[in-house]
Amino acid sequence: MIQMQSMLDAADNSGARSVMCIKVLGGSHRRYAHIGDVIKVTVKEAIPRGKVKKGDVMKAVVVRTRKGVRRPDGSVIRFDRNACVLLNNTTEQPIGTRIFGPVTRELRGDKFMKIVSLAPEVL
């Protein structure tokens, strides 16, 4: 569960290292974001010569959470850290060309098929 002020790792090569959630998109009083939800983030730590810099406000999709996701068969997939992939603000396509770490099958949809295809492992 990601809410405002939550810190996340950037799971791509966009240049951001850590980001902070500043808004959960999709409803006026929506409080929590789960895997596959789009959030608004600000870059808190970035590497030199990256595509984004510290202070940039971007959209991002949550790909890993400590809370995890429950499958219809009753199993739960949890991760050690919260992580997201930064998106272009207008097209909502990933900024980076590589994805680091596993992503879940819940991202398989029309919107995020690119992220699933770039990921090294889909759980």
Curated annotation (Swiss-Prot):
Designated gene of the protein: rplN
UniProt keyword RNA-binding present: yes
Subunit structure: Part of the 50S ribosomal subunit. Forms a cluster with proteins L3 and L19. In the 70S ribosome, L14 and L19 interact and together make contacts with the 16S rRNA in bridges B5 and B8.
SMART domains: Ribosomal_L14
Protein role: Binds to 23S rRNA. Forms part of two intersubunit bridges in the 70S ribosome.
Keywords: Ribonucleoprotein, Ribosomal protein, RNA-binding, rRNA-binding
UniProt similarity note: Belongs to the universal ribosomal protein uL14 family.
Domain of life per record: Bacteria
A cellular component annotation (GO) from this entry: cytosolic large ribosomal subunit
Organism lineage: Bacteria, Pseudomonadati, Pseudomonadota, Gammaproteobacteria, Vibrionales
InterPro entries in alphabetical order: Ribosomal_uL14, Ribosomal_uL14_bac-type, Ribosomal_uL14_CS, Ribosomal_uL14_sf
A Pfam family of this chain: Ribosomal_L14
UniProt name for this protein: Large ribosomal subunit protein uL14
